[in-house]
Amino acid sequence: MGYQPQFTITPKLLSRVETVAALRERIQGAAVELSWIPALQKDTRTRNVHASTAIEGNPLTLEQVRALEEGREPAASDKRSRREVVNYFAGLRYVEKRVSIETLRHDDLFELHRILAGEVMDQGEAGRYRTINVRVGNYVPPIADDVSGLMFELLDWWNRHAGELSPVLSSAILHYRFEAVHPFADGNGRTGRALALWELYRRGFDTHHIFSVDEYYWEDRPRYYSALAKVRESGEDLTVWLEYCTEGLRQTLENVWLRVQAYNGQSATRLVLRPRHEQLLALLRDHGSMAPAELWQALKLSKQGTLNLLRPLMAAGLVEKVGSKKMGRYILSSP
């Protein structure tokens, strides 16, 4: 019978899919100045690597991950943590080079897992389906003897039927089902998230590879794991998981739009947004406008620290000050 995902297109899910599609079109339409694409791709790759490895407990900060990408060895970091990060960079590059593959095979999955999990496996062998039974918290995945057959079914669905759905949905379904089967002895989480990105890439949803959706999962890991668990609790009904993932894509694309504006602004400034910048921009997006004192209280920074954050954002045309000098407020600039 094969794998047949079960879900309901609720009004909430439909609305989120439509919102994500509109945001994507806006971003794609702005991607006309190709000179800045490589810098944004590099920043996105670094963010995805940091987020996906951090979900699994890797302690390296975003700046330390960025240092490794640039060939520098971050201070106070252990060998395994560095290896996990280096592996994930290599895994994403493997995926990026294979976006045109029409049919995914078991060997493609084995090679991706071999790259991601090489030298960092706690049990089992990288690049081979597990031969042992495993337990993940309270969840007991299928027994080892069933893994190969279940993965044949998943690959058959991915290759033959995923294209019938929006990539927003098919990537989320692939992500969940891979984690549910848990085909490898270790390293399934990061492999599943890489596969979800692969689906967005090969379906042409993220043609420039500038969407760092893994940050959404990392920023609230308990909610991420809870959303996965709710599918099992509901008898494999994926509806709540799809609503969660589409909300994540919506937030991700809103952040990407801010980054695109930072690179594609009217000024010559090209700004790489740091987490603090994005926190400030999110505050302005949510509140509409904020006084200086409101900003530094919300950010828990000094007045000078807040001004230091604001200057590059204003220089890049992302933020502007309106009103009088004494009573002025900060707002997001209109696109």
For the regions a protein language model found, what residue spans apply to each?
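FIC/Doc superfamily catalytic core
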Residues: M1-P335
